A protein has these predicted regions:
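N-terminal, charge-rich interaction modules
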Residues: 2-10
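Short, compact, well-ordered microdomains
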Residues: 55-94
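Local beta-strand/beta-hairpin segments that build beta-sheet-rich folds
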Residues: 38-42
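Short aromatic-glycine-(Arg/Gly/Cys) micro-motifs in beta-strand/loop hairpins
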Residues: 9-37
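Short, intrinsically disordered, low-complexity terminal/loop segments
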Residues: 1-3, 93-94
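A short, charged, amphipathic alpha-helix used as a generic interaction element across diverse proteins
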Residues: 45-59
């Protein structure tokens, strides 16, 4: 189910919520298998992290994730690149 199908008046994203942008160590744009967790890139708000993520090269987006407090059905504790892209598309409607 896509995020767009979950939208109603009760769904709201707090873009000022604390969040961290993290990147998985990589070799040739692929996650390095020898690591067990991503490292910190940005410690700020969800908005800060989304902006920094979108500024990264598209070919590297799969290496990044955003960690934040869950917010209903729209925002989970760990946001993958595809989830971040959906939130960016919905942002103008929220």
């Amino acid at each position: 189910m896509s995020l767009a199908s979950n939208m109603d008046d009760r769904n709201h994203i707090d873009f000022d919520a604390p969040a961290t942008l993290r990147k998985w160590p990589s070799i040739k744009n692929q996650r390095a298998s020898a690591t067990d967790r991503p490292y910190l890139i940005v410690d700020g708000t969800l908005d800060d992290c989304i902006r920094q993520f979108m500024a990264k090269p598209m070919g590297q987006h799969q290496l990044y994730e955003i960690h934040t407090a869950p917010q209903g059905e729209l925002v989970s504790a760990v946001l993958s690149a595809s989830h971040i892209h959906e939130i960016v598309q919905l942002r103008d409607f929220l």
